[in-house]
């Protein structure tokens, strides 16, 4: 029971940091005026009226490029701490990182063979 007193500051911080955004959204929702009109329903593109249908569907190629980018971005996030502590971790960490990079390279080769990286 006495060990729970060590976490009082943590719980207070968690409650306050959760309450502030909730209160901000609630207060802005209550106090903001709601005006519906044709300007609110029209799409806005750099101050120019759009020509044609404003709701265009993106091609799947954009999503595939974004997905491949995210995978290799996450790889960088995981490999940076490993590279900074390489001399401390030893050979087993090197083998694990090598297997990790090998799996990602196999995924890249698979995406390349399936044509996910081609822009045509």
UniProtKB/Swiss-Prot annotation:
GO cellular component, as recorded: chloroplast thylakoid membrane; NADH dehydrogenase complex
Record keywords, A-Z: Chloroplast, Membrane, NAD, NADP, Plastid, Plastoquinone, Quinone, Thylakoid, Translocase, Transmembrane, Transmembrane helix, Transport
Protein EC: 7.1.1.-
Subcellular location: Plastid, Chloroplast thylakoid membrane
Organism domain of life: Eukaryota
Coiled-coil residue spans: none
Transmembrane stretches, start-end: 9-29, 64-84, 88-108
Membrane topology: Multi-pass membrane protein
GO MF annotation list: NADH dehydrogenase (ubiquinone) activity; quinone binding
PANTHER family cross-referenced by the UniProt entry: NADH-UBIQUINONE OXIDOREDUCTASE CHAIN 3 (PTHR11058:SF9)
Subunit structure: NDH is composed of at least 16 different subunits, 5 of which are encoded in the nucleus.
Function comment: NDH shuttles electrons from NAD(P)H:plastoquinone, via FMN and iron-sulfur (Fe-S) centers, to quinones in the photosynthetic chain and possibly in a chloroplast respiratory chain. The immediate electron acceptor for the enzyme in this species is believed to be plastoquinone. Couples the redox reaction to proton translocation, and thus conserves the redox energy in a proton gradient.
Name of the protein: NAD(P)H-quinone oxidoreductase subunit 3, chloroplastic
Name of encoding gene: ndhC
């Amino acid at each position: 029971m006495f060990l729970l007193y060590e976490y009082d500051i943590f719980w207070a911080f968690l409650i306050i940091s959760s309450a502030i955004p909730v209160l901000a959204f609630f207060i802005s929702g209550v106090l903001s005026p709601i005006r519906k009109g044709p300007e609110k329903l029209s799409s806005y593109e750099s101050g120019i009226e759009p020509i044609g249908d404003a709701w265009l569907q993106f091609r799947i190629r954009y999503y595939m490029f974004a997905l491949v980018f995210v995978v290799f971005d996450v790889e960088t996030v995981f490999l940076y701490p490993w590279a900074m502590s390489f001399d401390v971790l030893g050979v087993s960490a090197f083998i694990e990182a090598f297997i990790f990079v090998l799996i990602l390279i196999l995924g890249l080769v698979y995406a390349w063979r399936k044509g996910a990286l081609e822009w045509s």
